[in-house]
């Protein structure tokens, strides 16, 4: 009887939800429970928050699958974010929370110089501090993740996204990208003051031809 009670308790509170268990074991347990469809949805991203009509917020939440992994989030509404997260936690089979991401590239509420101008400072320590402040502002707005820094080695000034990177020198790109990641993520992503970074874009993206975006890369 005691064994049955213990098994029933474990079923209600699975290992992957136990914060005292090492992260690797929690991830392994969670993955073992997931269906292929759930794994695919965790690798998918929807867009939310562009519809600012209050009457349509419910419709927007309804159209987002409860099992979605992440959102490109444009809203500043705590209500919309909380409703989406509530749906993910309560209506999905495994209760996996959603990651809310946004392009926090050169500041969030406080706007700093664009990345190529940051590189002109030759001051990665200052850039780290700026990214740290941007992370804090973004986290307070309910974001977990930024699609930054942009690491593109500029090869053609006609390309419209040159300004998003740190110039034409690979070493400079590396130094400032590292500083940015340190600023965004800090030493502890769970401290409520930092967000996850995302190095982008895919390898070779900056090697555009004739300045055209996406065409050959």
Residue ranges and their predicted role:
Residues 2-217:
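Glycoside hydrolase catalytic-domain context in secreted enzymes
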């Amino acid at each position: 009887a005691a064994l049955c009670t213990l098994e029933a308790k474990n079923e209600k509170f699975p290992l992957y939800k136990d914060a005292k268990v090492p992260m690797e074991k929690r991830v392994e347990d969670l993955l073992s429970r997931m269906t292929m469809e759930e794994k695919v949805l965790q690798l998918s991203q929807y867009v939310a928050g562009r519809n600012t009509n209050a009457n349509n917020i419910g419709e927007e939440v309804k159209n987002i699958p409860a099992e979605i992994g992440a959102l490109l989030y444009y809203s500043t509404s705590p209500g919309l974010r909380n409703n989406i997260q509530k749906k993910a936690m309560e209506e999905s089979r495994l209760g996996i929370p959603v990651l809310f991401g946004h392009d926090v590239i050169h500041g969030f509420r406080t706007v700093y110089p664009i990345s190529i101008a940051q590189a002109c400072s030759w001051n990665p320590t200052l850039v780290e501090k700026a990214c740290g402040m941007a992370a804090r502002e973004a986290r307070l707005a309910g974001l977990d993740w930024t699609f930054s820094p942009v690491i593109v080695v500029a090869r053609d000034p006609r390309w419209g996204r040159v300004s998003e990177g740190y110039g034409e020198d690979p070493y400079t790109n590396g130094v400032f990208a590292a500083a940015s990641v340190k600023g965004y993520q800090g030493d502890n992503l769970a401290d409520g003051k930092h967000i996850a970074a995302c190095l982008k874009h895919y390898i070779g993206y900056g090697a555009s031809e004739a300045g055209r975006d996406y065409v050959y890369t």
